[in-house]
Amino acid sequence: MMTAVAIRPERLRDHIAAALGARLRQITLALEEVTVVLAAADYFDAMRVLRDDPVCRFEQLIDLCAVDYSTYADAVQQGPRYCVVAHLLSVSLNQRLRVKVFCPDDDFPLLPSVCGLWNSANWYEREAFDLFGILFDGHDDLRRILTDYGFIGHPFRKDFPLSGHVQMRYDAELRRVVYEPVSIEPREITPRIIREDHYADPH
């Protein structure tokens, strides 16, 4: 089913603006993609509207990830550090939407879980917790999903050291895996050099 809203994303933008009302912080249309920015306090209710509204009807959450804006485009980001970005899909109406919400507290990033709206949010939110340390209130099983249980820190934060904090290895005497401080010595990262095409051709 192809609707006029799907064909003309500006109509989707205008309808979402009307449907969300005061819950909407910002809405933009670029490259035929609609992006909305929500406040953390309005996040869950607004997402429910986007799922249930008959002109939106976003039945699927197809992705949810996080961004650390502490440094961005070689500049210090003004405002909150952590942002969660969700991508919604309406299969029945053939339209998509990007939703951004910033965590209000950099030291304790916390947002409501949307697992109650879309089951697919379960592992996405666990990944955002594991890699960025963002907590999701109401998630029934918020534990690490990619790193191991003894992992220290959140590796996608921009202040996380490249070498990590600890390493693990098999200890033959103890006959088990052990954790120990990382033994990699810091070294200067050499930038990759890409030469122009045909630089070695004879003149």
UniProtKB/Swiss-Prot annotation:
Keywords: Cell inner membrane, Cell membrane, Membrane, NAD, Quinone, Translocase, Transport, Ubiquinone
Compartmental location: Cell inner membrane
Record's bilayer topology term: Peripheral membrane protein
Claim: Glycosyltransferase is one of the keywords in the record: no
EC number(s) per entry: 7.1.1.-
SUPFAM superfamilies named among the record's database cross-references: Nqo5-like
Enzyme class: translocase
GO molecular function, a single term: quinone binding
Pfam families assigned: Complex1_30kDa
InterPro entries (UniProt xref): NADH_DH_suC, NADH_quin_OxRdtase_su_C/D-like, NADH_UbQ_OxRdtase_30kDa_su, NADH_UbQ_OxRdtase_CS
Catalytic reactions on record: a quinone + NADH + 5 H(+)(in) = a quinol + NAD(+) + 4 H(+)(out)
Record's function text: NDH-1 shuttles electrons from NADH, via FMN and iron-sulfur (Fe-S) centers, to quinones in the respiratory chain. The immediate electron acceptor for the enzyme in this species is believed to be ubiquinone. Couples the redox reaction to proton translocation (for every two electrons transferred, four hydrogen ions are translocated across the cytoplasmic membrane), and thus conserves the redox energy in a proton gradient.
PANTHER family: NADH DEHYDROGENASE [UBIQUINONE] IRON-SULFUR PROTEIN 3, MITOCHONDRIAL, NADH DEHYDROGENASE UBIQUINONE IRON-SULFUR PROTEIN 3
Membership in a protein family: Belongs to the complex I 30 kDa subunit family.
Protein name: NADH-quinone oxidoreductase subunit C
Taxonomy of the source species: Bacteria, Pseudomonadati, Pseudomonadota, Betaproteobacteria, Burkholderiales
Gene label: nuoC
